[in-house]
């Protein structure tokens, strides 16, 4: 394709054969999906199990509450739980670096 706007010539690379249903020996392709799913008791049992949430790793960088040094943490959590941790860090929860933890 060259130019600012696509043309029909750019999109259609080859002509599809046209076929009259009365004279054509091959029927047109049926694109309808006839798939059916079986219902069973096993599927109902899966509904009782809790939904497994996606657990991801998060890198947290914050300052030590004692000396102000940068403290890096890597945690594994769900998105909802990491939001709770974020709120706790904004409120009263403080992280202490290893050097300050040894002193006290």
From Swiss-Prot:
One of its GO terms (molecular function) is protein domain specific binding. Its main location: host cell. SUPFAM superfamilies: E7 C-terminal domain-like. A motif (Nuclear export signal) lies at residues 82-90. Gene3D superfamilies: 3.30.160.330. It holds the Pfam family E7. The keyword Transmembrane helix does not apply. Highly phosphorylated. Homodimer. Homooligomer. Interacts with host RB1; this interaction induces dissociation of RB1-E2F1 complex thereby disrupting RB1 activity. Interacts with host EP300; this interaction represses EP300 transcriptional activity. Interacts with protein E2; this interaction inhibits E7 oncogenic activity. Interacts with host TMEM173/STING; this interaction impairs the ability of TMEM173/STING to sense cytosolic DNA and promote the production of type I interferon (IFN-alpha and IFN-beta). Plays a role in viral genome replication by driving entry of quiescent cells into the cell cycle. Stimulation of progression from G1 to S phase allows the virus to efficiently use the cellular DNA replicating machinery to achieve viral genome replication. E7 protein has both transforming and trans-activating activities. Induces the disassembly of the E2F1 transcription factor from RB1, with subsequent transcriptional activation of E2F1-regulated S-phase genes. Interferes with host histone deacetylation mediated by HDAC1 and HDAC2, leading to transcription activation. This is Protein E7. It comes from Human papillomavirus type 32. The gene is E7.
